[in-house]
């Protein structure tokens, strides 16, 4: 659901997630039939031409032929958008369909830090037709640093889901981000990664607690809902939470009253560790410093 009766504001520092947010939540009108026609055309393609994807990723995360199709489709979406045949949301919907199709067949163990070598590529690219809604006209989608964005917006409820540990999302999903941006940078290493320095999150570093305190301080909302797990110091240094429970509670309680909800879950691992007692927690803060009246749209 896109919360059709509410005004929705989304933000993500990764362009790939921003594109998906545009596809699902943007208020721009789009043609369902146009989307269907493009996807039927893309799924009928039988090509094996050289392009950026074949030159850099053939027989790694995808077969050479699927790389050829991915590269052709992504370039065609851009060409059609620049020619005026697609509006911004239609472009986002088609890119989202491509990214989802890629992720469904990718030769990985759940992320793009590495690919499995010597495997048979038995699954091939097939785009599905997304079914987004015609949303409210005042929805907004952003692609920027959350700590800066919150200084300019206000809401009834702000939901925050920052990275928990030192594993940067731009590292784990570099290929998805690369195709979404389509700037065709040089890549290096076994994992074929581009330069990602501009996408690094402070929430994965020793600056996480300082960044968190700054974020909460500048939020203008009646409710703040934070998602953060209880890894603390249970795993290795890369897996451990960067923001302690003590800091979370101190910062939120300075803003208002806090209630915590939790649910157990099995953590994702590559089979090298077995960490038990994992909980996903929601920290709900009723802010004592917020806009005087809830926003009505």
Which positions does each model-derived feature cover?
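Conserved SAM/SAH-binding loop
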Residues: 144-148
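Class I S-adenosyl-L-methionine
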Residues: 242-288
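Class I S-adenosyl-L-methionine-dependent methyltransferase module
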Residues: 7-9, 13-132, 170-205, 210
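A short acidic (Asp/Glu
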Residues: 2-3, 19-23, 152-155, 168-177, ...
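A short helix-to-beta-strand connector/capping loop
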Residues: 132-139
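Conserved proline-anchored active-site loop of SAM-dependent methyltransferases
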Residues: 1-2, 10-15, 151-172, 224-229
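Conserved small/polar residues in nucleotide/adenosyl-binding loops
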Residues: 289-297
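Conserved Class I SAM-dependent methyltransferase catalytic core
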Residues: 201-256
């Amino acid at each position: 659901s896109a919360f059709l009766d509410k005004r929705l504001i989304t933000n993500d520092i990764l362009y790939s997630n921003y594109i998906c947010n545009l596809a699902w939540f943007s208020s721009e009108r789009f043609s369902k039939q146009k989307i269907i026609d493009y996807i039927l055309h893309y799924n009928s393609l039988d090509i094996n031409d050289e392009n950026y994807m074949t030159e850099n990723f053939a027989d790694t995360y995808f077969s050479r032929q699927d790389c050829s199709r991915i590269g052709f489709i992504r370039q065609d979406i851009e060409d059609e958008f620049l020619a005026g045949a697609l509006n911004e949301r239609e472009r986002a919907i088609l890119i989202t369909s491509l990214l989802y199709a890629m992720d469904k067949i990718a030769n990985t163990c759940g992320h793009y830090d590495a690919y499995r070598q010597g495997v048979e590529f038995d699954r091939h690219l097939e785009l599905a037709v997304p079914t987004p809604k015609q949303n409210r006209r005042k929805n907004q989608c952003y692609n920027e640093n959350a700590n800066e964005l919150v200084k300019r917006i206000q809401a009834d409820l702000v939901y925050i889901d920052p990275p928990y540990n030192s594993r940067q999302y731009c590292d784990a999903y570099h290929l998805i981000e690369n195709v979404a941006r389509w700037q065709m940078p040089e890549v290096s290493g076994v994992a074929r990664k581009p330069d990602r320095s501009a996408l690094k999150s402070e929430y994965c570093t020793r600056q996480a607690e300082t960044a968190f305190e700054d974020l909460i301080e500048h939020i203008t909302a009646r409710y703040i809902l934070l998602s953060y797990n209880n890894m603390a110091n249970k795993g290795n240094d890369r897996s451990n939470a960067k923001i302690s429970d003590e800091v979370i509670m101190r910062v939120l309680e300075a803003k208002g009253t806090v209630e915590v909800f939790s649910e157990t879950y099995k953590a994702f691992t590559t089979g090298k560790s077995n960490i038990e007692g994992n909980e996903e927690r929601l920290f709900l803060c009723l802010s004592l410093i917020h806009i005087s009246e809830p926003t009505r749209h």
